[in-house]
Amino acid sequence: NNIKLKPVLGQAIEIDINDSEVDLLSLPKQFNIDGINIITKSRSKLVIGSTDEYSTKPEKKVFEKLTNFLDKKPSWLLKGKISKKWFGIRSRPVGEPSPIMKNLENGLIICTGFYKNGILLAPACSKWVANEIREYLS
């Protein structure tokens, strides 16, 4: 079995917006601009994250990196406070789309999808794995 994977970096920040005139719930619940995922968590809380295909080291200036898709940042975003930062390394298939979910041979399955483009894939992937195991055991 010749499945190639490479490491990619995911980074995200949660920003608290302390501006009574801004209601983040007026934005879509989740949207993507140029590969940057924006997720509205509440009226005053926003998560911005992305995957960096070319690095596995987290950026020191994560706010600037994750908001550089905006030509002109709104003042409420510039005044926001970063309440959380996180990063992680995940695998990405080389030469085929993610997630890889394959029954390679009798009793050997592979599932590489946990998180992609702001979408948690683990529940669906786990369900697929459970079904494959059930079928194998029956």
Regions found by a protein language model. Name each.
Residues 60, 122-123:
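Conserved strand-to-helix beginnings and helix N-cap segments that scaffold or border functional pockets
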Residues 66, 101, 115, 133-137:
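Generic hydrophobic, helix-prone segments enriched in Leu/Val/Ile
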Residues 19, 52, 114-115, 125:
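A broadly conserved detector of short glycine/acidic/proline-rich loop/turn motifs that flank catalytic sites
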Residues 108-122:
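Glycine-rich phosphate/pyrophosphate-binding beta-alpha loops
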Residues 123-138:
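Internal hydrophobic alpha-helix adjacent to the cofactor/substrate pocket in enzyme cavities
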Residues 1-105:
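Active-site substrate-recognition segment that forms the wall
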